Amino acid sequence: VITLLWQVMNEAINPLQTRGKLVILTGKGNNGKGTFQDMLKNLVGGGNFSTLRPDQFKGFELGSLVGKTLNIGDDIENNFLPEVSNLKSITSGDSITINEKYGRVYELELKLLCMFSANEIPKTKDRTNGWYRRLCIIPFDADFNGKKENKAIKQVYLKDKQLLEWV
């Protein structure tokens, strides 16, 4: 799993070489998913990530992905997803239609990593091999419940320039 997490970090900061994977971090709460996502946000920088959830990959909301290298949907619900075609296209590096609110409509190939965290993997109508081969499901099995929270991890360490450069 550690090697896979390093590969995900590489994909987040080098999105032009897409591996065609949609990353889903799974596991019960308080296990490090959010901390890992915060580290990635700090690695790519403030203006380079978006925060859409899978059910928002449609309509005007797609415009918020333009120019980003990473999308992180944190703590997504286990709701049924009737439509995942835009997610599949973005993951593969294929063109999608961007419809700017009060603006133009155009086709664009987005180069970004889509990552979501969830307690359970969301269900979808799509049961094709094309959907399943794009999924990269990473289990987070740690359990930090009952342990004293080290607030410095998120407030200091994950923002430390030297640490981020090392990563």
Write out the residue ranges for each language-model feature.
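Segments of Walker-type
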Residues: 1-3, 47-51, 65-66, 109, ...
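P-loop NTPase catalytic core of nucleic-acid-dependent motor ATPases
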Residues: 1-69, 136-138
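Conserved catalytic/switch belt of AAA+ P-loop NTPases
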Residues: 13-14, 41-45, 84-106
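Alpha-helical scaffold elements adjacent to nucleotide-binding pockets in ATP/GTP-utilizing enzyme cores
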Residues: 36-39, 68, 82-90, 97, ...
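AAA+/SF3 P-loop NTPase mechanochemical coupling elements
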Residues: 60-67, 99-117
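Conserved AAA+/SF3 P-loop NTPase catalytic/coupling segment centered on the Walker-B
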Residues: 69-92, 106-110, 124-131
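Conserved nucleotide-binding/hydrolysis micro-motifs of P-loop NTPases
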Residues: 77-78, 119-123, 141-146
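Phosphate-sensing "switch" segment of ASCE/P-loop ATPases
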Residues: 108-111, 127-167
